[in-house]
Design a protein with these regions (language model features):
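DEDD superfamily 3′-5′ metal-dependent exonuclease/proofreading module
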Residues: 1-491
Length: 491
């Protein structure tokens, strides 16, 4: 039922970073919102990352960000086209291959996972865009580099969209902004000022607004895409989400990776679906698992169960002659809670620490060093003044067929999927009379999903928290109050 789509993703690396700089900055400045995703070299202790205390959890993520690095950054710029029917967006997606110039830890699990999903470490070490972590050094902030690109992102003052994004935000801060503050309250205070238009977490939106059966990235994206396609095919009232991409010609073709989003095919009969992957989008057996990891089949299976239970409830209510209450099967917790009670202990890899009872009952999936519990990626756009790409609602034609990598896991395409989920959720909650400054999804504004917690992390400055000195100085530079870049030692 879902429609096919080919997403052009622009691969950005050291040999074309300056050439594509103007295009990236224009895409950022003209967007309605920006979705971001990262690939990391590791995360460290999984037990510490799921600590009951949020302050302890933050310290563990900080330690990971200071000792590990961002290997790849993806961002998708969604620009709403006001002259088009419904909710139509021009989407431009970029996938940046990065190389930290400082020593960092890279975990074997991360390498294995990324290689399985097509990450090219040879290309990273040969052509990765260099960056350093912590505070600014000298005049580097004024050049064409990652820190300057992050400044452009802040200056654009656009809503930022992430998926399960607390870890992403901590790594972005340490790698491209400044040294991380020691306390969570200070970090949150800084974050609230860095992104005044708000931060939205589609993991939170999927769990508590859309209330899907599962909330890992690929599942949420394909479910949104399927529901949107059904609504269009049904011809009912209401707005729908449509996407347009740029057409690329000439030398730009060599930079683009076309990522296919194919139709899901209905399959009858018993589906041998991996229960672990179905619940979390992650399986310890990886590609060696004998059960199906096909997200389309998983969604089809969930839809069938939902429909069967709806019919059963209808027959039961008809028999009783009364309208029964909606049952718990519509809750997104059911699949996970049932699975956790019966399968999780057996499915955890030997190399991972055993989950606590608090973690078992959490509505979250196991965490891999590189966000292995989420899947997808994409990129796009040319910024040459001489030959601006022409916008088109048609899927771009690929110059040659490329063999798809295992899965769709790349930072750029993950960012695209994150943005699509947000566009779909926004479309469901959109107020036609809202002002340009109103929150895009008020119920999800500045709420970061917390694994194992029933409440999100609110990105709002507390009256008891002060901003860090490095952040205050950096904000002066971002908004033009200061042209000097403070030495590295600023705390």
């Amino acid at each position: 039922m879902s429609s096919s789509m080919i997403v052009p993703v622009i691969d950005v690396q050291g040999n074309n970073f300056k050439e594509l700089w103007a295009a990236m900055v224009i895409a950022i400045k003209t967007s309605s919102f920006i979705a971001i995703d990262t690939e990391l070299s590791g995360l460290g202790s999984r037990k510490a990352l799921l600590a009951e205390s949020i302050e302890d959890r933050y310290k563990a993520i900080c330690h990971a960000a200071r000792t590990r690095s961002i290997l790849s950054l993806g961002f998708a710029c969604y620009k709403k086209l006001d002259n088009k029917a419904d909710s139509t967006y021009l989407v431009q997606v970029y996938n940046l291959t990065l190389l930290c110039s400082e020593e960092y830890i890279i975990e074997p699990q991360s390498v294995q996972f990324l290689v399985q999903h097509g990450f090219d470490f040879n290309k990273q070490y040969a052509q990765g865009i260099s960056y350093y972590k912590g505070n600014d050094k000298g005049g580097d902030a004024h050049g064409v580099n990652m820190r300057s690109l992050f400044v452009e992102l802040l200056r654009a003052n656009k809503p930022l969209v992430v998926h399960n994004g607390l870890i992403d935000m901590v790594f972005l801060y340490q790698c491209f902004y400044a040294h991380l503050p020691d306390r969570l309250g200070t970090f949150i205070a800084d974050l609230s000022q860095m992104f005044p238009s708000g931060i939205y977490d589609t993991k939170y939106a999927t769990e508590y607004e859309l209330r899907f059966t599962a909330s890992y990235l690929e599942y949420a994206y394909k479910k949104c895409k399927l529901d949107n396609s059904k609504a269009i095919a049904g011809g009912g009232n209401g707005s729908h989400v449509f996407l347009e991409f740029c057409k690329y010609t000439g030398s730009m073709q060599s930079y683009i990776d076309y990522r296919p989003c194919l139709d899901n095919q209905n399959q009858d009969g018993v589906l041998n679906i991996c229960v672990q992957f179905s619940a979390y989008g992650w399986c310890p057996n990886g590609s060696q698992c004998s059960m199906s990891h096909d997200t389309d089949l998983i969604i089809q299976h969930d839809e069938k169960i939902r429909e069967d239970k709806r019919k059963k409830r209808k027959r039961k209510n008809k028999k009783k002659g009364s309208q029964g209450p909606s049952e718990a099967c519509s809750s997104p917790q059911v699949k996970r809670s049932h699975f956790e009670e019966t399968e999780l202990d057996q499915a955890v890899p030997i190399s991972e620490p055993a989950l606590t009872e608090q973690q078992k009952t959490a509505s979250s999936e196991p965490t891999d060093a590189t966000h292995a519990f989420e899947h997808g990626k994409a990129a796009s756009k040319n910024g040459n003044e001489e030959s601006q790409p022409e916008a088109s609602s048609e899927a771009p034609v690929r110059p040659k067929e490329k063999k798809a990598e295992g899965g769709t896991h790349r930072a750029g395409f993950d960012a695209f999927m994150t943005g699509y989920i947000f566009a779909y959720a926004r479309n469901l909650t959109e107020n036609t009379e809202e002002s340009s400054t109103a929150p895009l999804i008020p119920a999800c504004l500045n709420k970061l999903f917390l694994s194992g917690k029933s409440v999100p992390l609110h990105v709002a400055k507390s009256t008891f928290s002060k901003s860090s000195k490095a952040h205050v100085h950096k904000m002066d530079y971002v908004w033009g109050k200061s042209t000097a870049v403070k030495p590295e030692g600023t705390a």
